[in-house]
Regions:
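Conserved interdomain linker/interface between the two RecA-like ATPase lobes of SF2 helicase motors
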Residues: 1-103, 151
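Conserved C-terminal RecA-like helicase domain
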Residues: 92-172
């Protein structure tokens, strides 16, 4: 049995909320001193008590906080110099959707130099694919996404794609 207790990259859990009042995405530690973050619990419980603009109750109350979009989360991580990052999504389809939403938002997280380096890594891992294989696997979309600094990594991907993503992530 081999046991490794050192992680090459530390895993830290955060909770993100979009504050509809300030129009800002905010990040909070999920666990503080071994307990669920009470500040987040207070924010969410107080948010349900906010009244409408007239100050009267009744009808639907506006929600103070909502889940941020995938591009908002990535922008927040970039602003806080927390990239590269892993976002855990429990559905292959949602993993793919997350990449598409970031790409559709026009996100590019790499410099020209990084893009060139990423393309070389992906091309090296996929050099044995035929042109037909590349078409069937939508290789050109994959390499463009990864070169922009955005990719998914899930069990449904071919090993070549996953290995390329892993190498890119390990290199930062």
């Amino acid at each position: 049995m081999v046991v490794e207790t050192t992680r090459p990259i530390e895993l830290v859990n955060h909770f993100a909320l979009f504050d509809n009042a300030s129009k800002q995405c905010e990040m909070f530690e999920t666990v503080v001193a071994g307990e669920p973050n009470r500040h987040v619990q207070r924010l969410l419980s107080n948010a349900t008590q906010i009244r409408g603009r007239s100050g009267q109750s009744g009808g639907k109350k506006p929600r103070r906080f909502s889940p941020p979009t995938r591009p908002e989360i990535v922008e927040l991580l970039e602003d806080k110099s927390m990239l590269p990052a892993i976002v855990f999504i429990f559905s292959r389809a949602q993993c793919e959707d997350a990449v598409h939403s970031c790409m559709n938002a026009g996100m590019v997280l790499t410099s020209l130099e990084e893009e060139i380096q990423i393309r070389e890594i992906v091309e090296r891992h996929c050099e044995n694919l035929t042109a037909d294989d590349k078409d069937a696997l939508e290789y050109h979309h994959f390499i463009d996404d990864v070169a922009s600094g955005i990719s998914c990594h899930h069990a449904g991907m071919i090993p070549m794609f996953k290995e390329a993503v892993e190498e890119c992530f390990a290199q930062g």
